[in-house]
């Protein structure tokens, strides 16, 4: 081998580093954070993350430009689609009650580099999302005062004509972010109390809108004379669904907060289900009364609800709507500031991000450094940048996280379950017994070997029909089927999204491609379903695996393909920056990297029964104990 060139063994070792998994610890209730959040706290955090400015702006935009009164169907379909992703988060959040959300879920099932990239994108999602909401909050308040704040700033500082920068510095948006960061740094209890207050006001205002809206409803506004219920047809409903889907992306704050929940195994799935139901009900009912109060084609997209009440002679109701809108945006702001430092804390605690962000304040028991640093960064973005061009960039990071979490659910279900971290030795008997361990290099012989089927093996009832799969080692056929499932989902999504006109295929070619992609997708799904899964856990589990996460993967892929190419270019650039951070810092400081040298020198332990209560433990060296270092290979 030429000097200086890495050997095959070194390359394999490098790939193992990239794909190493974080051990899935079932007993993970111990934490340096304070477990003080109840189911109600988590539910209101989720509602606050989902029911924000979208209710007051998005509803009117989709109704007027995309779906008409059928906007309620768009919200319904979007809620069902979000439910698929929410179920995946619920299972992981209950089973792994640690902070980190999609980052942690990917780390324990798919590998380190994938987890870092997901965490890196979620970080940007919260950073830009919080800044965008702060600017929307500032703009809404400025509009109430007839844009006097903007006029004052422009008259004293002038108008900026620099690309990517705002036309004027938004000091109000930056100020509200700094104030909110100060409150969030006081502890989870203070953040929860603020969120309770704003969420309660927001829900009361929503209830007021629904009740008064139904009183003022005119069924004639859905008649054929006004364009009918679905003036844009089925395609308009689907286009509205793609937009409405982003109204439900805030539920992951619940999973990110699971390490501070009192009873996460029960509270996390319950809070996700309740908050998603409340948010879906609010969006569907508000969109219904909005299009019943006034004709859909006369709506003002910028302030649809306030304008609708004004048209019906209830201008005073516009003030109540404004109060509800401000409170709703406050809850979204708190949700972003609450979640972002905890994602960074999880990455720093694992060694993949700078260690300073893993520090927890001894009194408030929150990652105060991350809160203040990223609160200031968020304030700078809101102060200086024009965020309109970056808003769509948020969706791709969210959808990618949803896709990886759904894939991780399939991986986890077909993996062999990890045993307890401190297994009790069984009483000695006449035969050797075997214990599994987190490490591949440690084996305790002490539990009787059985021939029971393991996760990843073909179901016994199907062996006569699928015998060619029975020869595969456990998990091999599952891994191939999952890879083919994801590839076929991308192919099928391309066919469905771009259509015959964009692909420039003859009709028969388009139909053939659709049939082949669909058949491969279904076949890989059936192969996955033909294998054993883990036994039912004590915590919440998704029904119909692998069907439910597979549908989530397909849907998320379709929505990602509908994004513009500029969004994809920005996304690729951000990924490249993340790879520089990972290879420059994360891969060398990873806690799993520090664990590996110990694992390489760990002996195998065999328990020999002695016929008494005492057992003799002897160290048995592996067959190839000392790894040979090859030239050009550096650890």
From Swiss-Prot:
Membrane-protein topology: Multi-pass membrane protein
Membrane-spanning parts: 42-62, 66-86, 113-133, 197-217, 229-249, 270-290, 318-338, 365-385, 391-411, 478-498, 508-528, 539-559, 567-587
Recorded GO CC terms: membrane
Annotated glycosylation sites: 146, 151, 195, 221
Gene3D superfamilies in the record: Amino acid/polyamine transporter I
GO molecular function: amino acid transmembrane transporter activity; carboxylic acid transmembrane transporter activity
Record keyword Magnesium present: no
Superkingdom of the organism of origin: Eukaryota
Record-listed Phosphoserine modification sites: 422, 427
Major subcellular site: membrane
Location in or out of the cell: Membrane
Family assignment from sequence similarity: Belongs to the amino acid-polyamine-organocation (APC) superfamily. Cationic amino acid transporter (CAT) (TC 2.A.3.3) family.
Described function: Involved in the transport of the cationic amino acids (arginine, lysine and ornithine).
Xref: PANTHER family: CATIONIC AMINO ACID TRANSPORTER 4, INNER MEMBRANE TRANSPORTER YGJI-RELATED
Annotated protein name in UniProt: Cationic amino acid transporter 4
Source organism of the structure: Mus musculus (Mouse)
